């Protein structure tokens, strides 16, 4: 995935190592070779996205796509999503929510906050693998908007 010649960095925020490996494997299988920055908690991901000063200026010229689990060990994915979409420098970055939560109110809340896609991770491994393969296909046709 490129934007005007600039590579898009995929930021994966997923605390389950097995899920993270499966997601990356299927993204690669779909032919997407972009850099993947993996984080197992919201704090380290936000440090990367917002920078030490928390302003987000560090991401002003980055082309990012965020894969976000809602169930993180240190904060909720909703908190992470709110900070991303509430930041001037990050708000146009696409966010794909990938989580086991299928509560319709929580799904709507994610969309209300600015999530671009919400994918429910099945608990069953084969179903989960299939959902991630579909995510890989999604990546193969997706374009990321340019940063301002």
Regions found by a protein language model. Name each.
Residues 1-11, 17-37, 41-46, 50, ...:
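Non-catalytic signal-transmission and effector/linker regions of two-component phosphorelay proteins
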Residues 56-61, 85-92, 113:
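Conserved phosphotransfer cores of two-component systems
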Residues 68-69, 99:
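Active-site residues of response regulator receiver
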Residues 73, 103:
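The feature encodes the CheY-like receiver
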Residues 92-102:
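A short, hydrophobic beta-strand element within the central beta-sheet of small alpha/beta folds
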Residues 116:
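Short, glycine/charged-rich "phosphate-handling" switch motifs in NTP-dependent
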Residues 121:
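A Lys-centered signature of the CheY-like receiver
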């Amino acid at each position: 995935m490129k934007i005007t010649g600039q590579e898009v960095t995929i930021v994966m925020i997923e605390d389950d190592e097995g899920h993270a490996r499966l997601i990356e494997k299927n993204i690669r299988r779909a032919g997407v070779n972009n850099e993947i920055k993996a984080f197992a908690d919201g704090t380290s991901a936000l440090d990367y996205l917002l920078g030490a000063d928390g302003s987000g200026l560090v991401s002003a010229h980055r082309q990012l796509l965020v894969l976000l689990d809602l169930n993180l060990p240190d904060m909720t994915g909703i908190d992470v999503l709110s900070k991303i979409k509430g930041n001037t420098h990050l708000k146009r970055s696409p966010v794909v929510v990938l989580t086991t939560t299928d509560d319709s109110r929580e799904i709507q809340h994610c969309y209300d906050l600015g999530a671009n896609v919400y994918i429910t991770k099945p608990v069953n491994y084969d179903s989960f693998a299939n959902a991630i393969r579909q995510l890989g296909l999604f990546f193969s046709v997706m374009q990321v908007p340019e940063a301002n």
